[in-house]
Curated annotation (Swiss-Prot):
The active site is at residue 135. InterPro entries: Acetaldehyde_dehydrogenase, Acetylaldehyde_DH_C, NAD(P)-bd_dom_sf, Semialdehyde_DH_NAD-bd. CDD domains: ALDH_C. Pfam families: AcetDehyd-dimer, Semialdhyde_dh. NAD(+) binds at residues 15-18, 166-174, 293. Belongs to the acetaldehyde dehydrogenase family. Its EC number is 1.2.1.10. GO terms for biological process: catabolic process. It is an enzyme of class 1 (oxidoreductase). Keywords: Aromatic hydrocarbons catabolism, NAD, Oxidoreductase. This is Acetaldehyde dehydrogenase 2. It catalyses: acetaldehyde + NAD(+) + CoA = acetyl-CoA + NADH + H(+). One of its GO terms (molecular function) is NAD binding.
């Protein structure tokens, strides 16, 4: 295990729900990272108060404030949990001072390559900026990729249902970016010819856990092989998101050539339809257990940065 002297120092930009949960996760679970700074814009935010109480350097003056902290010179990793628009500016500003800094983007900005740890992290260990897609993407793209490993996927559609209470101002401000980024990543990372993403904010009380439905249209293939691939992938995600689970058995439907589906932008489809149903329970480090959508983002971001930091140690 890495000692405090060999751990890489990290800063978190965004002192809201995601940033605060990420800070606690790093403190409790990280082998290679140490939280050195928490950055916000609201001096009264709970995240900054908690960070200060835990001995972490704080600033409420945004990314400019981060660069004025004495610890900035030691920072190797930055997690950005702000918004898509803010991230573009934050990354550009940081690189004027530290061109080689590693940035883990938890917004839908996607100025770096999409990263879903169980699918394509190995290809991006040296990337200066990686994008964690979205909560829906982290939950569902592994399932699309699992089918892609067995059969050619022509189309994949995901529906992410999250509790309204777990959707903070950042999530709500990025709904359009959420659907666009997730759809593109379903194709680029999941391997689908065409992808579509839908997000549903569920106002139910008491709040429901995150649930995701994945529909995959592929060429005909061995159902047992697809099911086994899905189960292996779910187990791989569970390694860093323990609350991730298949809600029920994988379902299959044959779409015959004489009764094809019509997919907008794709045309007629016949082949195999695979349906996967997922539930994500949060670890409740800082956020409630129903906020699995936020937990999977912070867990995936930490898993990504851990591997990157470990690769630097072993280089």
């Amino acid at each position: 295990m890495a000692t405090d002297n060999t751990k890489r120092k990290a800063a978190i930009i965004g002192s809201g729900n995601i940033g605060t949960d990420l800070m606690i996760k790093i403190m409790r679970r990280s082998r290679h990272l140490d939280v050195a700074a928490m950055v916000g814009i609201d001096p009264a935010s709970d995240g900054l108060a908690r960070a200060a109480k835990l001995g972490v350097a704080t600033t409420h003056e945004g990314v400019q404030g981060l660069t004025r902290l004495s610890v900035f010179d030691e920072i190797d990793f930055v997690f950005d949990a702000t918004s898509a628009g803010a991230h573009v500016k934050n990354d550009a500003f940081l690189r004027t001072l530290k061109p080689g800094i590693r940035v883990i983007d938890l917004t839908p900005a996607a100025i770096g390559p999409y990263c879903v740890p169980v699918v394509n992290l190995d290809a991006h260990l040296d990337a200066p900026n990686v994008n964690m897609v979205t909560c829906g993407g982290q939950a569902t793209i592994p399932m699309v990729a699992a089918v892609s490993r067995v059969a050619k996927v022509h189309y994949a559609e995901i529906v992410a249902s999250i509790s309204s209470r777990s959707a903070g101002p950042g999530t709500r401000a990025n709904i359009d970016e959420f659907t666009e980024t997730t759809s593109k990543a379903i194709e680029a990372v999941g391997g689908a010819g065409k992808g579509k993403a839908i997000i549903v904010l569920n106002p139910a009380e008491p709040p429901l856990m995150m649930r995701d439905t994945v529909y995959v249209l592929s060429e005909a293939a061995d159902r047992a092989q697809i099911e086994a691939s899905v189960e292996r992938m779910a187990a791989a995600v569970q390694a860093y998101v323990p609350g991730y689970r298949l809600k029920q058995s994988v379902q299959f439907d044959d779409i015959p050539a004489n009764a094809p589906l019509h997919i907008p932008g794709l045309g007629r489809f016949s082949g195999l339809k695979t349906s996967v149903f997922i539930e994500v329970e949060g670890a409740a480090h800082y956020l409630p257990a129903y906020a699995g959508n936020l937990d999977i983002m912070t867990s995936a971001a930490l898993a990504t940065a851990e591997r990157m930091a470990a690769s630097l140690v072993n280089a």
